[in-house]
């Protein structure tokens, strides 16, 4: 009583306290960062190593394995995967959430140093690492195009000037430059001319290397002067290499230009990048795992004018893709939804109270509670994201509940003729415990979520804490500001209604009277209601088991990623043509705004595409509908497949794949893995629950297998090293010398001119100079035949691995796909030597599925404990919790009706319903107990009176919560796929709960009261005590 009086009779102090809360909230709001979702990125580090010309199997055994053994000893590594292809190895380390990425980076560097002695000596550089996840979609893609400069020159500008500067921007984790390679002098050898001149490929390599040398020459001095010695020992351009003498034949000089075509070209000609059908260099920017995407993008944009000034005017620097516009648009949609929710909730209060003065009170208390929450969010290090803003939207219905309960009870006393200040004090005292019980039991629902580990726990933490803080501030405001405003603003007389609202008032009275009559009938037929309650419990279980489930709603971020997978024996020229063909098909789609892509590098038969869709208000289809439409057109392209997927804000795992979900096969027997992977992939491709099934197992590449006749080689005076050196010189794009320039270093690359390597007959033109100086054709001591060879070798941990990726067809859920895969694996009879498990997002979904039921039970148990403590009773909490089954049925039925799978967002809705619907029962039980103790009423009379007296506030609180959630259901635009499941769950649960709990709660109350009397030996003595 004294606590409430302190604020009611000191209005200035109460107002200033509320103003202080509001000002702190406004300040916190201005300083809060913006993000699509809470920070849930796993710390990921990528280790890269190269050995030019080495086969994938050689890279896996001699480079990947030693590094994996050393890196695997690092503490906190949750997953380690590697992929080895021609000349390169990439190892992805994913760490536990609580692992500091900078400390992990130091451990990674130490592990690389420890493995250095076990790595091949021919590696051109030490392995390097980056603090970025290569499987993440870039947050921004920049393109360089020019009609004047070559692709190599553009790549040089991008990698030498732009990429290092961008990498220094806060939040940037990696800048990957693609579409070409650094400039280089290329020496294209003519095998026939070499043979005619008696010059070996090693002779050319040695001559070029010796002609371009950068060594210190020293200085000359006399008594008074000093001269630095400088020579023309370096060759910089193709024109300078052309006249280089490499050999003498019969006294005549053989120059490099006589046996080769020397050009200013690029280091690797098997690279191509494009943007909207125009050749381009791509700068793909990824953020650090802990960085804020909006802040990072804004920092990059602010740097762009400076970057443009560092490159020539003839080079066009453009933003081809930017993830931030859709994120900003999504947050604007949520903010609008929040404002609409507040307006609807205030409208509900106005309709029920039919008083402008009374409506002003929640119209003030609700914003104070919501705005004050921003200060706590800032102190907790949170961000303004879809989930935290949705928490505030839902909180609108909660925070007004507290004000409604207090306001309605005070208004009831005023209508009875009590003076305003007395009514405020008396009314607040009566419902103070009710409001406290409602708020504490609601916060108790979220305690299990706060203790939840892994990605789901991290994802829901901001939502949970934000909502709990809003409820806490609302509790304070409803017991301080609300009664003070009631006492000083409301009048003792019954408010005069406007004519247009009298109809609503009469309808409410009629509803209350009708409810009273139906409740009497129900209380006389309690067994029927008991059967209905048991039926809802059984229906809950059946619906939960049968409803499709997924991890997180599929988002439409306005960005698609595409992975091209062509025949494993395809040439680079043909692959570049496939890239152009696919880009044309996609560019012609009316919903597409921009297309960029690249191919080449160590994997000739693959490519990547990044597609920016038009804004949501300029297209009628969702991203998935656009993918479905394009899938039909892309399937007509022969010789290659393009797999599209919508970029998601949450992506788990470091392995790059061509689809959203992964199923990984592991085995210590590589032969068994290669035997069973095609069988499993073909089986999964037939399942209707899966789409775009593909695999990263590339073991069917074309190979030319050379078999040396060692006896013949010995007789001819040729060793294996000379033969291997010949092949590397001819076909390996061998880097034979380095050109030093002020800003960068460039290579001299030697190989047989591509004009002479169009078919297998090129091998017949190769020869080796033996120890007697004679030219011996390769065909004299070697035989060759076509064979198959892997294009890549993948590991997970230290086991061989193949990952099958898949998307979900329209209308299918991740639970459908998971169950179908499990059935298929059982039907195939896969041996125990091959182990299958879900990876990435699918793995997190499996883990979440196993904990969902436990989480719901834990929430109910927590609420029971809190209510038991508050009521000092084992029974009354059960009465209150009896409202939950009907809410569960309503939520699950609503999801089924809207074809929405049960996701993590829907789980939040279920948890919220546990907190919302029990409020009705709390108000009934509180007043019934009060009537029994002080009104000398029987339990049936008490609960009947409580139901009628609390009918108006129950309807108000339920409709307030319903209207607060309704904008989530009806909202469109960016991010609506996240809001819809939450709104559908809450609205469906509230509607069903409101229809049933008004009748089931009093029946359950009477049932437990009779049960208590039956088992109580001395009820009278207990009452006396």
Curated annotation (Swiss-Prot):
GO molecular function: xenobiotic transmembrane transporter activity
Cystine crosslinks: none
Membrane topology: Multi-pass membrane protein
Subcellular compartments: Cell inner membrane
Keyword Cell membrane: yes
Segments traversing the membrane: 3-23, 333-353, 360-380, 387-407, 431-451, 469-489, 528-548, 853-873, 875-895, 897-917, 953-973, 984-1004
Matching InterPro entries: AcrB_DN_DC_subdom, Acrflvin-R, Multidrug-R_MdtC
Induction: The mdtABC operon is transcriptionally activated by BaeR.
Coiled coil: none
GO cellular component, one term: plasma membrane
Keywords, ordered alphabetically: Cell inner membrane, Cell membrane, Membrane, Transmembrane, Transmembrane helix, Transport
Endpoints of the signal sequence: none
Pfam families reported for this sequence: ACR_tran
Similarity comment text for this entry: Belongs to the resistance-nodulation-cell division (RND) (TC 2.A.6) family. MdtC subfamily.
UniProt subunit comment: Part of a tripartite efflux system composed of MdtA, MdtB and MdtC. MdtC forms a heteromultimer with MdtB.
Protein function: The MdtABC tripartite complex confers resistance against novobiocin and deoxycholate.
PANTHER family membership: MULTIDRUG RESISTANCE PROTEIN MDTC, PTHR32063
Protein name according to UniProt: Multidrug resistance protein MdtC
Origin species: Escherichia coli O9:H4 (strain HS)
């Amino acid at each position: 009583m004294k606590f409430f009086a302190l604020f009611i009779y000191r209005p200035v102090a109460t107002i200033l306290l509320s103003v202080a809360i509001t000002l702190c909230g406004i300040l916190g709001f201005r300083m809060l960062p913006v993000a699509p979702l809470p920070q849930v990125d796993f710390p990921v580090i990528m280790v890269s190593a190269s050995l030019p010309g080495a086969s994938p199997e050689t890279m896996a055994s001699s480079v990947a394995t030693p590094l994996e053994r050393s890196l695997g000893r690092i503490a906190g590594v949750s997953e380690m995967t590697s992929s080895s292809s021609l000349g390169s190895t990439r190892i992805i380390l994913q760490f536990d959430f609580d692992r500091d990425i900078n400390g992990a980076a130091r451990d990674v560097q130490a592990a690389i140093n420890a493995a250095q002695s076990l790595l091949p000596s021919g590696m051109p550089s030490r392995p390097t690492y980056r603090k970025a996840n290569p499987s993440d979609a870039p947050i921004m893609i920049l393109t360089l195009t020019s009609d004047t400069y070559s692709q190599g020159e553009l790549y040089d500008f991008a990698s030498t000037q732009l990429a290092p500067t961008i990498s220094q921007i806060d939040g940037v984790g990696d800048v990957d430059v693609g579409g070409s390679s650094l400039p280089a002098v290329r020496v294209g050898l003519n095998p026939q001319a070499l043979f005619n001149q008696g010059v070996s490929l090693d002779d050319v390599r040695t001559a070029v290397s010796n002609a371009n040398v950068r060594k210190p020459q020293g200085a000359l001095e006399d008594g008074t002067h000093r001269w630095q010695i400088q020579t023309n020992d370096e060759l910089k351009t193709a024109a300078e290499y052309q006249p280089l003498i490499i050999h003498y034949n019969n006294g005549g000089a053989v120059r490099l230009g006589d046996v080769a075509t020397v050009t200013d070209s690029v280091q690797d000609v098997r690279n191509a990048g494009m943007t909207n059908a125009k050749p381009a260099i791509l700068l793909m920017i990824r953020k650090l795992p802990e960085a804020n995407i909006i802040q990072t993008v804004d920092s990059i944009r602010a740097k762009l004018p400076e970057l443009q000034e560092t490159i020539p005017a003839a080079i066009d620097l453009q933003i081809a893709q930017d993830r931030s516009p859709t994120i900003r648009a999504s947050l604007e949609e949520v903010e609008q939804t929040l404002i609409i929710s507040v307006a609807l909730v205030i409208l509900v209060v106005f309709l029920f109270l039919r008083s402008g003065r009374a409506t002003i009170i929640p119209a003030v208390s609700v914003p104070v509670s919501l705005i004050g929450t921003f200060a706590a969010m800032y102190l907790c290090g949170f961000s303004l994201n879809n989930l935290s803003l949705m928490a505030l939207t839902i909180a609108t219905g909660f925070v007004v509940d507290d004000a409604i309960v207090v306001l309605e009870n005070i208004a009831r006393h005023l209508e009875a003729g009590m003076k305003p200040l007395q009514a405020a004090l008396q009314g607040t005292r009566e419902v103070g415990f009710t409001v406290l019980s409602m708020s504490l039991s609601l916060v108790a629902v979220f305690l299990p979520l706060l203790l939840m580990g892994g990605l789901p726990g991290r994802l829901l933490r901001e939502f949970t804490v934000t909502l709990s803080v809003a409820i806490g501030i609302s509790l304070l405001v409803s017991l301080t500001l609300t009664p003070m405003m009631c006492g000083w603003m409301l009048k003792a007389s019954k408010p005069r209604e406007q004519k247009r609202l009298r109809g609503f008032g009469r309808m409410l009275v009629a509803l209350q009277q009708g409810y009273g009559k139906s409740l009497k009938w129900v209380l006389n037929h309690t067994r029927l209601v008991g059967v209905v309650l048991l039926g809802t419990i059984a229906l809950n279980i059946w619906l939960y088991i049968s409803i499709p489930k997924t991890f997180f709603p599929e988002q439409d971020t306005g960005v698609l990623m595409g992975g091209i997978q062509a025949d494993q024996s395809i040439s680079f020229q043909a692959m570049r043509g496939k890239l152009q063909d696919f880009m044309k098909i996609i560019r012609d789609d009316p919903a597409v705004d921009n297309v960029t892509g690249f191919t080449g590098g160590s994997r000739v038969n693959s490519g990547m595409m990044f597609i920016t869709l038009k804004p949501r208000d300029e297209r009628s289809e969702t991203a998935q509908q656009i993918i479905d439409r394009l899938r039909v057109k892309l399937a007509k392209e022969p010789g290659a497949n393009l797999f599209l997927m919508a970029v998601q804000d949450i992506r788990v795992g470091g392995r790059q794949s061509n689809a959203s979900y992964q199923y990984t096969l592991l085995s210590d027997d590589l032969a068994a893995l290669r035997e069973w992977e095609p069988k499993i992939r073909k089986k999964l491709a037939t399942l209707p629950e899966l789409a775009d099934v593909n695999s990263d197992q590339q073991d069917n590449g074309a190979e030319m297998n050379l078999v040396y006749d060692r006896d013949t080689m010995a007789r001819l005076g040729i060793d294996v090293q000379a033969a291997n050196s010949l092949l590397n010189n001819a076909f390996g794009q061998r880097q034979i010398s380095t050109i030093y320039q002020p800003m960068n270093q460039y290579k001299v690359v030697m190989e047989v001119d591509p004009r002479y390597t169009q078919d297998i007959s090129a091998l017949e033109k190769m020869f080796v100079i033996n120890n007697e100086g004679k030219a011996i054709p390769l065909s004299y001591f070697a035989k060759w035949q076509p064979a198959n060879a892997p294009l890549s070798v993948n590991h997970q941990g230290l086991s061989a691995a193949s990952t099958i990726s898949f998307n979900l067809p329209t209308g299918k859920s991740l639970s459908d796909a998971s169950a179908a895969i499990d059935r298929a694996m059982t039907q195939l009879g896969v041996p125990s030597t091959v182990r299958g498990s879900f990876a990435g997002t699918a793995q997190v979904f499996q883990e979440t599925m196993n904990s969902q039921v436990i989480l719901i039970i834990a929430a109910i148990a927590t609420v029971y404990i809190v209510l038991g403590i508050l009521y000092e009773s084992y029974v009354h909490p059960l009465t209150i919790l009896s409202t939950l089954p009907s809410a569960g049925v309503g939520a699950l039925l609503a999801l089924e009706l809207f074809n929405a799978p049960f996701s993590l967002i829907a789980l939040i809705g279920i948890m919220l319903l546990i907190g919302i619907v029990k409020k009705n029962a709390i108000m009934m039980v509180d007043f019934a107990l009060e009537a029994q103790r002080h009104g000398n009423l029987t339990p049936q009379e008490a609960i009947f009176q409580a139901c009628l007296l609390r009918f108006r506030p129950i309807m108000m609180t339920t409709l307030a919560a319903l209207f607060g959630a309704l904008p989530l259901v009806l909202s469109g635009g960016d991010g609506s796929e996240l809001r819809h499941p939450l709104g559908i769950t809450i609205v469906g649960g509230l509607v069903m709960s409101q229809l049933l709990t008004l009748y089931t709660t009093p029946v359950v109350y009477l049932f437990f009261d009779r049960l208590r009397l039956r088992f109580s030996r001395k009820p009278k003595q207990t009452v006396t005590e």
